[in-house]
Regions:
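Short, charged, low-complexity loops and linkers
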Residues: 1-12, 85-95
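Acidic-enriched, low-complexity/disordered segments with a strong bias for Aspartate over Glutamate
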Residues: 2, 15, 56, 64, ...
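Acidic/histidine-rich alpha-helical segments that form the ligand environment
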Residues: 80-121, 131-137
Length: 160
């Protein structure tokens, strides 16, 4: 594996930073996940659901699979209009965490073989190297991880 690929993989799991993105889900109960402890905010369930949608879209791009970005935005926005309780009829919190972890692990595994300098033809902002999508993935996950931590602080379940 290329040294750059290794550094990107390490960044995904929190090497030399505070923690892995997966740490934020530890110990969260189903009821805590659907609660909105902060006025006018999303529940942790809704945030994780959003993270999965976009992580899967980012993975499609990394694998150079065709992506309809307008459709992806439409779906992501429609999903956010559902309430956490409506979403719960589809998946439990534990299933969501498993889905996120599976997709996250796939992104890490792809780093074993992928050329990060290879241009992505499916990227919406021009012909950028695959490395750019990994930066977007890490930034997106980090931002929303912070939102979940904020919810957990408000619930009194953070720090662990």
């Amino acid at each position: 594996m290329d040294a750059l690929n290794e550094v990107v993989k390490e960044s995904m799991v929190g090497d030399c930073t505070h923690m892995s993105v997966l740490e934020v889900f530890k110990g969260v109960t189903h009821n805590q996940a659907i609660e909105k402890p902060i006025a006018n905010s999303l529940s942790s369930y809704e945030i994780l659901h959003h993270m999965i949608i976009w992580q899967d879209i980012f993975l499609k791009n990394i694998k150079d699979e065709p992506t309809d970005w307008e459709e992806a935005n439409r779906i992501a926005n429609e999903e956010l209009t559902q309430t956490a309780k409506e979403m719960l009829s589809q998946k439990t919190w534990d299933q969501l965490v498993e889905d996120f972890t599976r997709s996250f692990d796939e992104a890490k595994t792809l780093l074993d073989t992928i050329d990060l300098s290879k241009p992505m033809e499916t990227f919406p902002y021009g012909n950028k190297p695959t490395l750019k999508m990994y930066f977007v993935l890490n930034q997106h996950n980090s931002y929303h991880m912070g939102q979940i931590i904020k919810n957990r602080v408000a619930q009194g379940t953070w720090p662990l």
